[in-house]
Amino acid sequence: MSRHHDMLDRKRGRKTTAASGADVRARLREIVGAENVLVDPERVEPYAGDALKEKFPPEAVVLPASAEEVSQILRLANERLFPVTARGGGVGYTGGAVPVDGGVVVGTDRMNRIREISADDLYVVTEPGVTTYALQQAVEQYGLFYPPDP
């Protein structure tokens, strides 16, 4: 048994941790707002896997809008000992964004602002939820392009 005190929820086919507790979910709702805590199976399913197609449904998906909210979520996870998986676009092939230990997925969907574009110095400052497409569209206005892969 891991330090997260998890067990397999055979009914739902996923691990359960302290993140399933009503008090934890209530606190998560306080942090990010009720509409940004997803627990329905249909709503968490898109966050259960990546391009490899192996699925591990989380107990909840939390969609913070700021670094401060992420900090509060991680503080709660540390206090209550439930696992957290960070997730951007979920298009990787390595399983890094897959919640294999259950717990909570912290989705960066709402953290999608481009903070700064410096055409002279060739850098961009973004939040973690900015999509490649949005970034390409933004830098194109400066006569630049973003080549994400070799």
Predicted regions and their residues:
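Short glycine/serine/threonine-rich phosphate/pyrophosphate-binding segments
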Residues: V70, Y93-T94
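N-terminal beta-alpha lobe that positions the nucleotide/phosphoryl donor
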Residues: V24-R25, T94-A97, L122
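Short basic, glycine-rich beta-strand/loop surfaces that mediate nucleic-acid
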Residues: D101-D109
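N-terminal accessory segments
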Residues: M1-A51, E79-V84
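Short acidic, glycine/serine/threonine-rich loops at helix termini
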Residues: G95-V100, Q136-A138
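N-terminal glycine-rich flavin-associated loop
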Residues: L28, L52-V84, T108-P150
